[in-house]
Regions:
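N-terminal active-site segment of His-dependent metallophosphoesterases
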Residues: 1-65, 157
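Active-site neighborhood of phospho(di)ester-bond hydrolases with catalytic His/Asp-centered motifs
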Residues: 4-6, 43-48, 78-86, 110-114, ...
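Active-site environment of divalent metal-dependent phosphoester hydrolases
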Residues: 11-14, 51-54, 84-100, 115-119, ...
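Binuclear metal-dependent hydrolase catalytic cores centered on His/Asp/Glu-rich metal-binding motifs
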Residues: 13-34, 65-66, 123-171, 188, ...
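Active-site-proximal segments of metal-dependent phosphoesterases and phosphodiesterases across multiple
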Residues: 53-74, 166-197
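Acidic/His-rich segments in extracytoplasmic proteins that coordinate ligands and/or metal ions
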Residues: 59-109
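Conserved beta-sheet core of the metallophosphoesterase superfamily
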Residues: 78-80, 184-241
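A short C-terminal boundary segment appended to hydrolase-like catalytic domains
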Residues: 241-335
Length: 335
């Protein structure tokens, strides 16, 4: 079975520098321990941090969203990672290149870089083609080394290059953060990709679960939400694993995940109605004016930030003094 999850951050972040996910991994924790993985399954996830020994940042900011390769050596990695997202360039070109080299040296497949936009593998007797790109602007460089903001014609050409595959998957970093339904342009692009030959479209970036639709008999999951990520806001804790089983009468299915206080995922059976993906599916083609859509985006962002500030205050005693000063200084600069 193919198992697909959403956003994965192996590192410490902004509000937990020195005691976040990365620090737990350094101490020997495995973030995937709750996924009940089988050797016969093929796992895919979005690598939304940097794995390198180098950074073009300084002080505290050189360690946020970055972890050293040696610290990941004890983790049983997923089989394939997407490396096209808005955090992989956070520490510069050399860091991104080092991360790709680390994955290759450890025989871990990756997709979404400019030189490796797609991959083809065999699973359950089928040839699977998968491609990845990002539809989000990059905040750290004007020339990202991953496949960024492609034109429709370029997307079509890459899909057509997978024509000999039995099954084609698109893994897309897109949309707006912290909202539970897609923007209308995403729906348009998703339909276009299905018409070009994609059999399954998987989205991520909003950091919360969004709905799905079936278009021309093909599944489109607009956002899987987080898999491993240091976010305390409750809507960012619910996620799914998408299952693709060519030996089952039900080709595509899903299971729910919950992100615990250690920011690691575990399977759950029951989920609040507001996060139920069948409910969220009813919102996919929600007709709403641009102004109202983005008003909801910014309202949710304010709620997310409020939770972060409260958590920051609660954890002041966990910060190293120099990290605390750097974070406060950066916060004041941004204001």
């Amino acid at each position: 079975m193919i198992k697909i999850v959403g956003d994965i951050n192996f590192s410490d972040g902004y509000f937990d520098a020195g005691f976040g996910v990365g620090s737990s991994i350094v101490q020997g924790a495995d973030p995937f321990v709750g996924l009940k993985r089988k050797d016969s399954d093929y796992w895919i996830g979005n690598f939304e941090c940097v794995c390198s020994n180098v950074s073009d940042k300084k002080a505290t900011f050189a360690n946020q969203f970055r972890i050293s390769p040696i610290c990941l050596s004890k983790i049983k990695h997923l089989d394939l990672y997407g490396v096209a997202n808005n955090h992989v360039m956070q520490h510069g070109n050399d860091a991104y290149k080092e991360m790709l080299a680390y994955l290759e040296e450890n025989h871990i497949s990756h997709i979404g870089s400019k030189r490796q936009k797609k991959s083809v593998f065999t699973h359950q007797g089928k040839q699977i083609g998968i491609l990845a790109f990002s539809q989000r602007p990059d905040n750290f460089t004007n020339d990202p080394l991953y496949w960024s903001l492609p034109e429709y014609s370029e997307i079509k050409n890459e899909i057509e290059s997978l024509a000999d595959c039995n099954y084609r998957i698109a893994y897309v970093h897109w949309g707006n953060e912290f909202i539970d339904f897609p923007y209308k342009d995403q729906v348009q692009l998703a339909h276009y990709m299905i018409e070009c030959g994609i059999d399954l479209l998987i989205g991520m970036h909003p950091h919360r679960l969004q709905g799905y639709e079936i278009y021309k008999g093909k599944y489109i999951f607009y956002s899987l939400g987080n898999c491993v990520f240091n976010m305390k806001w409750e809507p960012t804790r619910y996620s799914i694993v998408v299952n693709v089983d060519f030996n089952s009468d039900q080709l595509v299915s899903y299971d729910y995940l919950y992100i615990g206080d250690n920011f690691f995922p575990r399977y759950i059976d029951n989920i609040p109605d507001e996060y139920d993906i069948e409910h969220l599916a009813t919102l996919v083609n929600h007709s709403i004016e641009n102004e109202k859509y983005y008003a909801e985006v910014f309202c949710n962002l304010k709620q997310y930030r409020k939770v972060n500030r409260v958590d920051f205050i609660k954890n002041v005693h966990n910060f190293k003094f120099k990290d605390f000063l750097n974070i406060i200084s950066e916060f004041l600069r941004r204001k």
